[in-house]
Amino acid sequence: MPASFADTTFTDPSRIRNFCIIAHIDHGKSTLADRMLQLTGVVEERAMRAQYLDRMDIERERGITIKAQNVRLPWRVDDTDYVMHLIDTPGHVDFTYEVSRALEACEGAILLVDAAQGIEAQTLANLYLALDKDLTIIPVLNKIDLPAADPDRYAAELAHIVGCEPSDVLRVSGKTGVGVPELLDEVIRQVPPPVGDADAPARAMIFDSVYDTYRGVVTYVRVVDGKLTPREKIKMMSTGATHELLEIGIVSPEPKPTDGLGVGEVGYLITGVKDVRQSKVGDTVTAARNGAAEPLTGYREPRPMVYSGLYPVDGSDYPDLRDALEKLQLNDAALSYTPETSVALGFGFRCGFLGLLHMEITRERLQREFDLDLISTAPNVVYRVEMEDGTEHVVTNPSYWPEGKVRKVFEPVVKCTIISPSEFIGSIMELCQSRRGELGGMDYLSETRVELRYTLPMAEIIFDFFDSLKSRTRGYASLDYEESGEQESQLVKVDILLQGEAVDAFSAIVHKDAAQAYGHKMTTKLRELIPRQQFEVPIQAAIGSKIIARENIRAIRKDVLAKCYGGDISRKRKLLEKQKEGKKRMKTIGRVDVPQEAFVAALSSDAQADKPKDKK
């Protein structure tokens, strides 16, 4: 039985191959992984289900991979047994750091491209990551069974980018299984075996960790040097914390405990820790006694790029929201949150996310898995504000914008790569310029496809940039971005005043040129949403003390003359004067209650409504 060879660990490194699959969303990565699981016999036919490795409901429903997964596969070539570790990576731009860690655990990568669509921006971004790590790239075209597939054209495009011959590009179909056995043979032939010192102190890199309700944190590692055995004390090198190894094993594709892991092997550890933040992705694990002195390179803390406030619609759900966020954080070390209060929305949390998809998925999981109704404020980025008196403030929430004289404001910028059919160049450039973008360069990948490189302020992207890009290019363009420092900008805070009082939930930090438009848009929208009162209510948009836009909600007037039939004019005048006095008094002491629905509509319709060009 060849399967038993893969079940024993401490395999000779020359017979191990570690590889991952790089692909854009929807190019069939998880389906190809399914075929590999079936071909190698790791998963029985009856236990098989589509997208076997995507465990979360949300992953299966949206068809995206969020958490990296790994599987140990047995395979025979030329009468020799080999062990392959397939590490399944997320394809989305928000999870680039996870991808880079997963790539660190491999020696080779399958570059998978849809034969009907060609290469996309995120595939390119991940390909460059893989080339940085000196991985062996095996170019593969998937979905060749599709009627729309054009393998010859895209094989030439792929060969041009990777630098090989079009005939070297393998052609497979993850759906029907055509070409997959040949692909596995190629992996064994082309991917170099792992290199490591078996006698050195143990060093293993964490490339993922997940929280299991019953067993605590399960940490996935790739052993680089030495070996790890159960009941041994281990140390995390970034935090210095020590834990006892309760269980160690391989994933095939269900976890199987073993008596340890050797050089080049990929598997899991369980230490009984309850918090994912203690086993950080990218950290180095070593033995507590006689451990390694130098950690493996490349670890960095995940940094939130986008902030948004989350508030329960019903205030009594606040403790539930806190528990839910705590549980999600067990599984997602990149999510950060701090409690905050808003005069308008009550108690809630300010949450930090890696990007827009991360934010959307977190929100959806809170609503679905924990059954919460949430309002989320418009997303914003982190600003650095220098004041005239030399103090410096870091602003994650428009309400905390410092009062007083501002000397400089810095905002984060990102480098964007957009790949699109060449007929859309004009409208893409127009879109990027309207978002304060600077063109960095442009290359033709083939006659019909072009790559544009832009530097854009992060704040311009997080709103609806992606949607606008898709609608201008009929859905053909793809986008990838990476952070690249900060730049000084002319930014101002726009407050929305009701009856002269600022409403914190509607404040926004926008570029000076877009402030007028934002103010006008919000005041008009609120005029429609806030119910009429007994007295006139002014809605104003202001920068500091300067009003830049105003709308009025007209008063509702009761007909006080209804009871006077005929009668003297002075009687009527008396009643009207009395009403006028009352309105005046009301106006000075009256409060405007903004209904919850108006908040939800004003904050959310920003994202869906008339897609303003100038919105931050």
From Swiss-Prot:
The molecular function GO annotations come to:
GTP binding; GTPase activity; ribosome binding; translation elongation factor activity
GO CC, one annotated term: plasma membrane
- InterPro entries according to UniProt: EF-4, EFG_III/V, EFG_V-like, EFTu-like_2, G_TR_CS, LepA_C_sf, LepA_CTD, LepA_IV
- Catalysed conversion reaction: GTP + H2O = GDP + phosphate + H(+)
Q: How does it sit in the membrane?
A: Peripheral membrane protein
Q: Which residues form the tr-type G domain?
A: 14-195
BP GO terms, sorted: positive regulation of translation
Q: What are the EC numbers? A: 3.6.5.n1
- Sorted alphabetically, which SUPFAM superfamilies does this protein's record hold? EF-G C-terminal domain-like, P-loop containing nucleoside triphosphate hydrolases, Translation proteins
Q: Does the keyword Hydrolase apply?
A: yes
What are the subcellular locations of this protein?
Answer: Cell membrane
Q: Which domain of life is it from?
A: Bacteria
> Which keywords, in A-to-Z order, does the entry hold?
Cell membrane, GTP-binding, Hydrolase, Membrane, Nucleotide-binding, Protein biosynthesis
**Residues bound to GTP:** 26-31, 142-145
Write one Pfam family the protein is assigned to: LepA_C
Q: What does this protein do?
A: Required for accurate and efficient protein synthesis under certain stress conditions. May act as a fidelity factor of the translation reaction, by catalyzing a one-codon backward translocation of tRNAs on improperly translocated ribosomes. Back-translocation proceeds from a post-translocation (POST) complex to a pre-translocation (PRE) complex, thus giving elongation factor G a second chance to translocate the tRNAs correctly. Binds to ribosomes in a GTP-dependent manner.
Q: Tell me which family the UniProt entry assigns to this protein.
A: Belongs to the TRAFAC class translation factor GTPase superfamily. Classic translation factor GTPase family. LepA subfamily.
> Would you tell me the protein name for this molecule?
Elongation factor 4
Q: Which organism is it from?
A: Nocardia farcinica (strain IFM 10152)
Name of the gene: lepA
